[in-house]
Amino acid sequence: LKKRVNFLEEAFALLGIRDIEAVHGRAEEFAKNKAYREQYDLCVSRAVSNLATLSEYCLPYVKKGGFFVSYKSGSVKEEAAGAEKAIALLGGKIKEIVYFALPDSDIERSLVVIEKIKNTPARYPRKAGTPLKEPLS
């Protein structure tokens, strides 16, 4: 992971991007820190876990009125429906699902757009590993 942070820092410098910071650490730990919790307009994730788990990792970073956008593969309607209760518990609401195909292919992808409508309860995210082992439902 530190290699990724170093790469991002170099990319920011080369591109002249300012007022941005790449940090190394666990999402579950940083989300408990007031400097990061509910401070961002947008949080994005790639398809590394189910939507309920990703929401528990990401929604605590998003301030009210902001968005969490999850990049997922294929059709995600069933997964999204199964995660709605968890998303609501975490302060979010699914606003839309955008389906698209990657250029020059028939590979389907989707973006699940979740709006943050209320603050995430302080007990979330749970300790490291718990969201993955015991997803909210």
Residue ranges of predicted features:
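Conserved SAM/SAH cofactor-binding pocket of Class I
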Residues: 1-49, 55-56
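Short alpha-helix immediately C-terminal to the canonical SAM-binding loop
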Residues: 4-6, 76, 80
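Residue-level signal for inorganic ion chemistry
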Residues: 8, 72, 114
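Short "lid" loop at the C-terminus of a central beta-strand within the Rossmann-like core
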Residues: 28, 73-77, 102
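Short strand-turn motif at the edge of the Rossmann-like AdoMet-binding core
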Residues: 48, 71-75, 99
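Helix-to-beta-strand junctions that scaffold the AdoMet/dcAdoMet cofactor pocket
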Residues: 62-64
